[in-house]
Amino acid sequence: KERKTEEVIKEEKIKTSEIKTNEVNDEKASRKNIIIIGIIILVLVLGGLYIYKVNKVKQEELYSKSYLIDSGTLNLEIKNIDEVNQILTEAPSEYFILITYTGNKATYNLETGLKEIVDKYKLSDSFYYLNIKDMMNEDNYLTRLNSTFNTDKIKTVPIILYYKDGKLIDTVTRYDKNVINASDFQRTLDIYEYQGQ
């Protein structure tokens, strides 16, 4: 009986030892799984941040340029406001001037929408582009624009000025807080029954 009892005690000790070993192994495996999950989450977060930053840089780069100029749709760019009068002395009898700024999704979308209209009406030789982004930090930039174009109708930008025979006929502008869009320009062309070049 004593031997059986000793054997039973030994077997129980072995079983207890095996259970403890299994518990330790399970605990190690559990820690390992937690570490692996943590690393996966960290990689996903860092990967997401990287993708976000890359997309943001690409967007900023895209919006920092004029779509109409870069695509070759327009080639009549007024690079300096002080050159406006000199440049416009050589303008055709009927022309348009887009006064806008870059670095903004809404103005970029305006330009992409205008491309189709410029192409449809063959306006590339009668459509001027003026980017005033650098000017917009000045307190009096609207006054300066109005003075340059000899008008008082420039209240906001972007705006499109429509000239015929040297006179400002109309402006394409919005009176709400939204940026003008291509359909606003199309509406003006329709009102004046503009046929194109």
Where are these regions (language model features)?
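N-terminal leader/targeting and pre-domain segments
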Residues: 12-15, 25-43, 47-93, 182-197
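Thiol-based oxidoreductase modules, predominantly thioredoxin-like and allied folds used
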Residues: 71-80, 101, 123-143
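Extracytoplasmic/periplasmic, Sec-exported soluble proteins
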Residues: 76, 105-109, 152
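A short acidic (Asp/Glu
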Residues: 107-111, 139-141, 173
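Local sequence-structure signature of Cys/Sec-based thiol-disulfide redox active-site neighborhoods
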Residues: 85-126
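ER-lumen resident redox/N-glycosylation machinery signature
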Residues: 38, 113, 117-118, 168-181
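Thioredoxin-like thiol-disulfide oxidoreductase module
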Residues: 128-170, 177-195
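N-terminal targeting leaders characterized by basic, low-complexity, disordered sequences
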Residues: 1-18
